[in-house]
Amino acid sequence: MKAESADGHIGWGEIWCNFPSCGAEHRAQLLNTVIAPLLLNKDFSHPSSAFEEASTKTHVLALQSGELGPMAQVIAGVDIALWDLCARRAKLPLYQLLGGSNARIGVYASGINPDASLQTVQKKYQEGFRAFKLKIGFDTELDIANVRSVREWLDPALELMADVNQAWDLATALDNIPKLESYGLSWLEEPLRCDSEMRQWQEL
């Protein structure tokens, strides 16, 4: 999304949505019909003021409509755009406007799907990545084979992670996690559904 100030500066933000793709259209509608009318043609001294305005005035609506997540994602996209706008106006990188350091930040290659996992890791390694996160949670034998092949190819000092994308139930997680222990994963992401009962997380 694009934000523009009265003095002609612009900023860009991203409103994130996972599947289905029509969810992005829904968030665009929330932006245009709910959030934008709250903020357009108003004077905000700071991005946080606009964030507070949008969050406060839509909270009850989000509760009543069951839209807490989508509404928060739209407001976050607006917040990003306004911070970007302020940085461009100040002619500063955003990290400097926020007072941050210019120290190097480690990154990892993500979104490595189960088909051709090793080849994707090898390609990303050539591009300069030194940490990798595989998608698993499709088929246990395939998952283990992919993790094993990548781990065997990688230098043991390099990081390898896996993301289940909430595909397992508790029994499956308890069965599969021991099978992954020997591969030195730095972390295992979303092994259960995010709304799983606390007792399941505690047992895991």
Describe each region flagged by the PLM:
Residues 1, 8, 35, 78, ...:
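Conserved, mostly hydrophobic/aromatic
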Residues 4-89:
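Metal- or metallocofactor-binding catalytic centers and their adjacent structured scaffolds
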Residues 79-114:
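Glycine-rich, aromatic-flanked loop segments that form ligand/cofactor-binding clefts
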Residues 101-107, 128-130, 155-158, 184-186:
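Short, well-ordered coil/turn segments that N-cap beta-strands
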Residues 103-116, 135-137, 163-170:
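Active-site mouth loops of central-metabolism enzymes
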Residues 112-124, 170-177:
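Short, acidic/polar
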Residues 123-137:
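Catalytic domains of carbohydrate-active enzymes, especially glycoside hydrolases
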Residues 134, 140-204:
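Catalytic core of soluble alpha/beta enzymes
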